[in-house]
């Protein structure tokens, strides 16, 4: 398995009563945050495992035990606004980590980042490395000169999809996008005349 998300979907098919819930809103608008909190409260379980740091705030509103998994701290604390940095630090990092029953990090580097931001939680952090999936093998393939396929994994803000779309504007190719497309992505794909295919939760 290559990611915690893939592990979750794999376990859900094998363990009775285990459900994978995808929140309805992406991004951090107040409307989206409130909708996500209500959705999470409605679908919460006895144990709630939160995979994404971008939604760590929902842990503050759940009654069951919470496990937080941190891949990295990303750009959550990067903002020119002191108020935004303050809100994100407390409601995306400090309070969620304190309320969580346990915290997992995918590397020692990430664990050190979390300990630096929230020193109090250092004793409930475990490191669980992302595993390598043995079904993945390298297969040499001749480059497709006419209409090459370009793979883009992830649609989050840090994945830079919008700039990728603009960069490919005059290049005849097919953009293969793995992840949930937002309306702004679709609009830019049309505006820049990009031929594309979109996939979600691709099994091996």
Model-assigned labels for residue ranges:
Residues 1-204:
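Carbohydrate transferase catalytic cores enriched for Leloir-type hexosyltransferases
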């Amino acid at each position: 398995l290559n990611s915690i998300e893939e592990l979750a979907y794999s376990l859900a098919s094998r363990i009775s009563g285990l459900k994978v819930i995808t929140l309805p809103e992406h991004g951090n608008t107040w409307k989206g945050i409130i909708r996500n909190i209500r959705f999470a409260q409605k679908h919460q379980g006895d144990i709630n495992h939160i995979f994404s740091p971008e939604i760590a705030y929902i842990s503050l509103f759940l009654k069951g035990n919470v496990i937080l998994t941190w891949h990295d701290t990303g750009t959550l604390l990067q903002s020119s606004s002191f108020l935004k940095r303050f809100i994100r630090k407390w409601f995306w990092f400090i309070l969620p980590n304190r309320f969580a029953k346990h915290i997992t990090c995918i590397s020692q580097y990430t664990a050190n980042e979390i300990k630096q931001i929230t020193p109090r939680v250092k004793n409930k952090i475990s490191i669980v490395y992302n595993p390598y999936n043995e079904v993945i093998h390298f297969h040499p393939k001749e480059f497709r000169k006419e209409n090459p396929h370009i793979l883009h994994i992830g649609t989050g803000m840090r994945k830079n999809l919008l700039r990728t779309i603009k960069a490919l504007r005059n290049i005849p190719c097919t953009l293969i996008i793995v992840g949930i497309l937002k309306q702004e992505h679709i609009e830019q794909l049309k505006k820049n005349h990009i031929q594309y295919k979109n996939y979600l939760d691709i099994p091996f």
